Every structure is written in C-alpha cells, then in structure tokens.
Amino acid sequence: MSAIVDIFAREILDSRGNPTVECDVLLESGVMGRAAVPSGASTGQKEALELRDGDKSRYSGKGVLKAVEHVNNQIAQALIGIDANEQSYIDQIMIELDGTENKGNLGANATLAVSMAVARAAAEDSGLPLYRYLGGAGPMSLPVPMMNVINGGEHANNSLNIQEFMIMPVGAKSFREALRCGAEIFHALKKLCDSKGFPTTVGDEGGFAPNLNSHKEALQLMVEATEAAGYKAGEDVLFALDCASSEFYKDGKYHLEAEGRSYTNAEFAEYLEGLVNEFPIISIEDGMDENDWEGWKLLTEKLGGKVQLVGDDLFVTNPKILAEGIEKGVANALLVKVNQIGTLSETLKAVDLAKRNRYASVMSHRSGETEDSTIADLAVATNCMQIKTGSLSRSDRMAKYNQLLRIEEELAEAADYPSKAAFYQLGK
C-alpha cells in the first residue's frame, strides 16, 4: 500500500519572491507527501547545483521549470511503483539517474523536493510524525535555536560584513521557554534600535539590519537588548556569529569594509579571538574562506577548544568533504543544509559522520525559505541539538519554530532541551 503511484512537481515562490520547486508524492494507500525546497544567497562553491532556467524573460532567469520537468518526467518514471519506505534506494536511483557529482543534470532542487516528499508520504502512510519516522523510537532532544537578530553581509543592505549575529537561549529549561526568551530579546532589540534612530526593517532572515560602525557595536546592541529583556548575556543567553567569510575574502585577505581594515588569515583569527574574549560568543560559522584550509587550521587551533567552529561553505553538507575536514582537524561542527547535497539520505550520512567523529551538527534553513517545516522534524529526528532557522519574524521562519513547539508538546516528558550540553564537542 506504500508504493508510489504519482509524483508531481510545480513552480512556487520562496520568501524572496523567487521560484522554487514543490513536489507532491502520492502513494497507493491514498496518502500524499508534499515538500518545498529552499534556496541560499551566500552559497558554497561545492554545493550541489540548484538548476535555474536562465530564461531572462521569466523571473530574471530564475525560473525552475526545467527542474520541475525533470521531476515530472525522468524522476517520476524511475520511481513510480517503488515502496516509499525505501528512502535510501529511492535517493540512490536519483543520484544514478543524474550521474554527476553535484546533481548537475537533474538539479538538486529537483532531487531534494522528491526526496523530502517521499519521506513525508512514507511517514504519513506509517501513521507517524516525520521526526519519529526518520528518528525511530528512542529519546529525542529539541534543538537549542540560533536566532538571527542582526543581519549583515549578503542578507542585508547595510554596512556589516559579518552576515549573522545570533542569540542562543542556553539558560532555558525547554524549547518553549527558549523561544519566549528569543522573542522577548528580539522585541527589546527593536525598541533599542528605535531609540537610537536605527531603522527596524528586517533582512532576508527576519533580523534587523541597522547601519553600524563596527561589528562590536552590533554585539554591544545584543548585550543591551538581552539585559533590557531581563536576561543575562553569558549566562542565560550566548551569542553566535555566521561570518560567511568567503563573501569578503579576496586576494588572500579578509576585507572588513565597514571597519576599513584588511586581515591575513592569522590576523583575522586574532580579530575573531578578540570578539570572543570581549563578548559571550559560543559559536562561529564560516570564520574563514571555504578554500582557506590553512586559515581554518589556525582558527581551530586558536579557538576550537572553547568555541564551536561551524563549517557551512567549508563542508556543504557533503560527507566526502566533511571526512577531509575531520582528517585535517579543521572546525568542530557541521552546518546541515539539505539543499547543499540534494537528498535526505546523503544529509543523514553527513550528520552520522559528524557524530561519529565528535563534531556537532546544526540543522539549518536557507535565506530563501518557504512554509515547509521539514528541517524542524529533521533536527529532532537526528538529535542535532541545535537549529538555525532565522529570527523571530517572517512566517517562513516561524513555520519551523512553531513546528518545534508542536513536537515538544507531542513528546511531553520525553522531550529534552540540552541547553549548554548542545556544545558537547568543546573541551574534549
């Protein structure tokens, strides 16, 4: 009864008004699974290919009708009749059908839409929530959220080079309490920005995007907002950064235009260490350019024992590249973005590899999102213990947070909120 009888994709719009792929998978039992694919703004060079039409007369070339056609034709023909519970087998068929290292023929936006929709259909057919279908019957942790309250870089039109300034409510006793903490700080930050004459418009991920003179000024604003909301920075709340350093790395140097400075990798590692020493920063993502392995090694040696160093553009959720990073001893955490690799099975392999080597995993959204909340279930299913899914505004971000509230409610006493234990790889 769980055989696939129909697969149908369509072009929908994401949170930036750009086209993306949504897929429906219908099973013999009559149940349907639906999934929509996100899209990034700052992307790693080694990410799986997001197939765009290139037809400038439609959506400035960003249409996805080719990817939709691939789903409705080649992929559907290859998968109809197969049991939806055979997730790995289904994903492998698509990988072989594509025949490239980076999903360059079918498009990762085509394969991922199908992969996630198959999992949703199979979960529905089994009478299980997605997180239980993928994660089994064991104990589960709700993730500590990384909440992006100040946006810079490619996510905002302002003076900040560092892309994301985030808060992590580690003092909370539950996810519900953590979400409340984040929301209260977010609203306190809005009042603070208002009082200082900063605009309170938001960036792609729902955070504020004020024009500030330095990154320290952004962090100081976060300290003030945390205290104004009645919490203690460094105790109740820790900070996290996504530098997205590849976006300002040029000719072997890191150029912070807002501060009028350029740094070698050793100097930039010292710059980040200075921020860590001055502010309660527990996590830094993409602190070096994705190809600057020497810089990553320096940063890991300098900060890896006390700060989570997350590889996003560095690892692109690719098990092969992650294995290379583990062997070289760079970073200590993996950012997990399903569309960087293009199938659910490969995503789960990357998380498993990270865990086996004591690297933390952070489940993540993209800056171009939809109402799809699959990553919320994935964060719980994989026991990632951390999730990064934007600020406390924009319904595309709230969809994930609200799904986590529902999951915590369903799990009841079985739900664990890990707090600082989410950073289990530190101090090893």
Swiss-Prot record:
Lineage top rank: taxon: Bacteria
Any GO BP annotation: glycolytic process
Cofactor: Mg(2+)
InterPro entries: Enolase, Enolase-like_C_sf, Enolase-like_N, Enolase_C, Enolase_CS, Enolase_N
Alphabetical UniProt keywords: Cytoplasm, Glycolysis, Lyase, Magnesium, Metal-binding, Secreted
Binding positions for Mg(2+) per the UniProt entry: 242, 285, 312
Disulfide bonds: none
Sites where the protein binds (2R)-2-phosphoglycerate: 163, 337, 366-367, 388
Function: Catalyzes the reversible conversion of 2-phosphoglycerate (2-PG) into phosphoenolpyruvate (PEP). It is essential for the degradation of carbohydrates via glycolysis.
Family under the similarity heading: Belongs to the enolase family.
UniProt name for this protein: Enolase
